[in-house]
């Protein structure tokens, strides 16, 4: 009998009413994107202080850290505890996929610097350029490494200084670190491979209603997805290959 794979999702965000009504919560959004049949996924609402017991970390095959409206450089109790847990998982060489806030938290834990994005916030669909020389053919990217990948972006912070052992895997016009890896067990993405058009548009409408952005900014964000979408299938494949140690056949 094949042993069931177990994964833990660290949710650093609360569910919006839209996400709860449409998808049943962010747990379902992530598991639909990264999960496979027969796996067991546990969610821990770390933003609310919910964490696994340290003695239980060993039972998981991999971890995913979500995005957040909080800053990864803050020193709130839950953020400091998350950093401590991530450090322990890193020492165990367990796989961690860091997304947006998670990407920044891992950089912080490993000695990098995170701060406000120098070129300002992003809320849109954008392309990131792949550093092909940094990616080994046959790794979780497969043998056919693309020049660029489209991804939905939603952030106001960035990794300003990478940890010494990190390797940049992608960059963009405004951001030097769109994606990086550390050794074989840490893989981090500034964008949101789990987001779709509906989630982006709801976030745009919400921040506009709250007065965080102007109408022109909101219109420009939605315009980026008028005629195309994110490369979600490719992101799904890459992230699954990483988390599950798969060797692609393409």
Swiss-Prot record:
Record keywords, A-Z: Cytoplasm, Hydrolase, Protease
CC per GO annotation: cytosol; plasma membrane; secretory vesicle
Active site (catalytic residues): 100 (nucleophile), 192, 194
Pfam family of the protein (one): GATase
Entries under CDD domains matching the protein: GATase1_1 (cd01741)
Enzyme type, top EC level: hydrolase
Application of this enzyme or protein: Cancer prevention by GLSs is attributed to the formation of isothiocyanates (Scheme 1a) upon hydrolysis.
EC number: 3.4.19.16
Chief subcellular location: cytoplasm
Catalytic activity: an S-[(1E)-1-(hydroxyimino)-omega-(methylsulfanyl)alkyl]-L-glutathione + H2O = an S-[(1E)-1-(hydroxyimino)-omega-(methylsulfanyl)alkyl]-L-cysteinylglycine + L-glutamate; (E)-1-(glutathione-S-yl)-2-(1H-indol-3-yl)acetohydroximate + H2O = (E)-1-(glycyl-L-cystein-S-yl)-2-(1H-indol-3-yl)acetohydroximate + L-glutamate; 2-(glutathion-S-yl)-2-(1H-indol-3-yl)acetonitrile + H2O = 2-(glycyl-L-cystein-S-yl)-2-(1H-indol-3-yl)acetonitrile + L-glutamate; (Z)-1-(glutathione-S-yl)-2-phenylacetohydroximate + H2O = (Z)-1-(glycyl-L-cystein-S-yl)-2-phenylacetohydroximate + L-glutamate
Protein's cellular compartments: Cytoplasm, Cytosol
GO biological process: camalexin biosynthetic process; glucosinolate metabolic process; proteolysis
Residue ranges occupied by any Glutamine amidotransferase type-1 domain in the UniProt entry: 16-213
Known pathway: Secondary metabolite biosynthesis
GO molecular function: gamma-glutamyl-peptidase activity; peptidase activity
Role summary: Involved in glucosinolate biosynthesis. Hydrolyzes the gamma-glutamyl peptide bond of several glutathione (GSH) conjugates to produce Cys-Gly conjugates related to glucosinolates. The gamma-Glu-Cys-Gly-GSH conjugates are the sulfur-donating molecule in glucosinolate biosynthesis. Converts phenylacetohydroximoyl-GSH to benzylglucosinolate. Can use the GSH conjugate of the camalexin intermediate IAN (GS-IAN) as substrate. Required for the biosynthesis of camalexin, a pathogen-inducible phytoalexin with antibacterial and antifungal properties.
Family: Belongs to the peptidase C26 family.
Protein name: Gamma-glutamyl peptidase 1
Annotated source species: Arabidopsis thaliana
Organism placement in taxonomy: Eukaryota, Viridiplantae, Streptophyta, Embryophyta, Tracheophyta
């Amino acid at each position: 009998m094949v042993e069931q794979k177990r994964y833990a999702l660290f949710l650093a965000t609360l569910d919006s009413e839209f996400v709860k009504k449409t998808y049943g919560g962010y747990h379902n959004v992530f598991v639909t994107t990264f999960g496979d049949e027969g796996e067991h996924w546990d969610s821990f609402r770390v933003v609310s202080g919910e964490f696994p017991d340290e003695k239980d970390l060993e039972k998981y095959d991999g971890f995913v850290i979500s995005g957040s409206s909080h800053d990864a450089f803050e020193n709130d109790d839950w953020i400091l505890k998350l950093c401590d847990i991530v450090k322990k998982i890193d020492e165990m060489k367990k796989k961690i996929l860091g997304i947006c806030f998670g990407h920044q938290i891992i950089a912080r834990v490993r000695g990098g610097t995170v701060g406000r994005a120098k070129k300002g916030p992003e809320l849109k669909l954008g392309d990131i350029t792949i550093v092909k020389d940094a990616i080994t053919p046959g790794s979780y990217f497969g043998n056919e490494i693309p020049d660029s990948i489209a991804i939905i972006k939603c952030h106001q912070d960035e990794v300003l200084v990478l940890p010494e052992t990190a390797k940049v895997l992608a960059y963009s016009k405004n951001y030097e670190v769109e994606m990086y890896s550390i050794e074989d067990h840490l893989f981090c993405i500034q964008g949101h491979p789990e987001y779709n058009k509906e989630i982006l548009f709801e976030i745009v409408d919400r921040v506009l209603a709250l007065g965080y952005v102007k109408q022109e900014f909101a219109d420009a964000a939605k315009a980026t997805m008028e005629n195309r979408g994110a490369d979600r299938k490719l992101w799904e494949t890459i992230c699954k290959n990483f988390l599950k140690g798969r060797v692609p056949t393409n």
